[in-house]
Amino acid sequence: ESQCPGCKQMITTSFADAMKADGFLDMAELNFWPYGNAHESQTSSGWSFSCQHGTAECQYNYLETCAKNLVQCPVQYFNFLNCVEKLDSTTNYEGVANKCATQAQITNLADIMSCYKGTDAEALEHEVALKTEALSPPHQWVPWVTVDDVYDENVQDEMGDSLLNYVCNNYTGANKSKDCPPSGTVFAQASKDVCIKRDPTAFLQ
């Protein structure tokens, strides 16, 4: 979810560092699902969402989901996502989208904004909700990172410290990045901030 501090931290530090490594995406494929602990309800016209950190989080979830659907280059999409996560304390959604699209060299911002401002955003977010709710076991907090559809809290902690190191240590193919850390490299432990799914203080507008 776009405004969970733990999600922000993992994306803008460990994941961003990994994406800078030459050939990282030859070793791993990343998928992001901007939903988290949100709730959805069906309306006469489609779907309505309430988000753990309020209306702004829902708006940024829509923006990130529309970009995910329309930006074909995974590097550009990640750079857009990383930028949004750093700037989403403001409610100037369009301003953030413009700045981040420029930074990520995305040329179809008009399509993204058309999606974001229309009913496509809610329809796509519903698909993300279905993907999230289909997790087995169900997620209990976010970030909730799976590897090949399997969740392991210890693995998530490793990826929070260094996604690049985790992938390099577990990759068995022929395209290992030259930027993989040397064996035995020790990484500082990242904060383990999470946003609990059933937090009773959530959804206060």
Q: Locations of the language-model features?
A:
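N-terminal start-of-chain detector that recognizes signal peptides
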Residues: 1-5, 115-118
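Structural alpha/beta surface segment adjacent to cysteine/selenocysteine redox centers
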Residues: 2-104, 181-196
